[in-house]
């Protein structure tokens, strides 16, 4: 399984979330299969987007596209950190 972990600050969570939700169709078309949105315990505008993808190549192409750069700018995203991850193990305790 392939995952992407993105950590970034946003100027306004509600505005960011609306744009994030509006982009659901294009994220799905690009290969995103599921996601979590998490928020920092001490900073409501520091967001983590953790998602499962059909392939890392598709995820990279999507997140590095000019269209997504513009969407992030409109959403008020500041300095995103992208981590492209391969699953090694999963368990339940």
Question: What role is predicted for each listed range?
Answer:
Residues 1-70, 74-93:
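Short S/T/G/P-rich N-terminal loop/turn motif that feeds into the first structured element of a domain
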């Amino acid at each position: 399984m392939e995952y992407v972990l993105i950590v970034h600050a946003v100027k306004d969570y509600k505005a960011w979330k609306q744009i994030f939700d509006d982009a659901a169709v294009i994220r799905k078309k690009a290969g995103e299969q599921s996601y979590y949105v998490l928020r920092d315990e001490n900073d409501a505008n520091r967001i983590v987007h953790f998602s499962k993808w059909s392939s890392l190549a598709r995820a990279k192409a999507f997140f590095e596209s000019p269209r997504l750069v513009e969407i992030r700018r409109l959403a008020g995203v500041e300095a995103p950190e992208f981590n492209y991850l391969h699953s090694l193990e999963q368990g339940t305790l």
